[in-house]
Amino acid sequence: MRARHQDLLLIDVRGDSMEPDFLHGDQILIDRRDINPFQPGPFCLWDGDGYVVKLVERIPQKRGWYRVFSANDRYSAYEVNAEEVRIMGRPVWFARRL
């Protein structure tokens, strides 16, 4: 991957909503150039309160809406208008303590 440092964001995972994909304490590198959920998958979102990493997919029947869900099925999915969140980018790398 070739990216300028200003195109990258490094965040720490807090919580268990994305287990088993990402664990509490993991560090995730976000490519801020990849902000279109045309291909569903994990994205970093800014929800107004902070960064969250969730699985995101467009809802074809509802233009401008996303379905947001966790890898951990103990958490409920929800729908959100694209104007209510900001997609910060897609995870491209992560680090985990051994």
Tell what function each PLM region has:
Residues 3-98:
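Acidic/glycine-rich C-terminal interaction modules and beta/coil loop segments
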